[in-house]
Amino acid sequence: PVTAYLRSDSTPDDGLELELVYVENALPANLLGVEGKAVLVNGRFGFEAYGRIQKAKPAAIIGFTGNILDKDDETDHGICKIRETYTAEFGDNILVNLKAKDALEIVSKGAKKVKLFVSSTATESESRNVCVTLRGTDLADEIVSFGAHYDSVLFSTGAYDNMSGSVIIMELLRYFVANPPRRTLKFNWFGS
């Protein structure tokens, strides 16, 4: 099983059967001859790698998240998103994500073809940040900033990524409200 990237293109209703090519870290030499095929990339890919991949014109891109030691009953399929900055620069594609151990099995067994079914609808939503400033006493022009994101990270339970960071800076804020700081402190919770 796979999950589609948020903002992925859709396949036709009857799916898309493609030749599969493992392109490792998507270096230029690995991307030769992949036009019209599905490419399996090591892990997730950044802006530059996405650009290289798109330049090679594959019909679909497959990445993976997690670790080969992840236990099925303790982890979800990672939900990934292709950022607008990527697609604005390099275009859209069909993008899916699978678990690392499934990617290992696909490569180990020498899979040659994949059939993908992706139904995706683009939506826009708004995210908000929460910012609190505590003005310092005698060194108010010096600023110390704390930040954490409070959006959902679906691959984890949220306790570590990043609820713990959000709670820690909330407790720091509580402390410094009761004990005014010498320097100005900024506390920032980011929605995404």
Question: How should each PLM-predicted stretch be described?
Answer:
Residues 101-103, 169:
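Intrinsic low-complexity, polar/charged intrinsically disordered segments
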Residues 53-57:
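Non-catalytic positions within long, well-ordered alpha-helices that form the structural scaffold/packing
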Residues 1, 63-66, 70-82:
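Protein/peptide-recognition domains central to ubiquitin and immune signaling
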Residues 1-38:
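Noncatalytic luminal/extracellular "stalk/propeptide" segments of secretory-pathway proteins
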Residues 43, 130, 142, 146-192:
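Alpha-helical metal-binding/catalytic segments enriched in His/Glu/Asp
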Residues 7, 11, 22, 39-44, ...:
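Second-shell loop/turn segments in exported
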Residues 10, 26-28, 131-140:
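Short beta-strand-to-loop junctions in surface cap/lid or active-site-entrance loops
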Residues 20-22, 38-41, 60-63, 95-97, ...:
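Structural recognition of the beta-strand scaffold that forms the well-ordered cores
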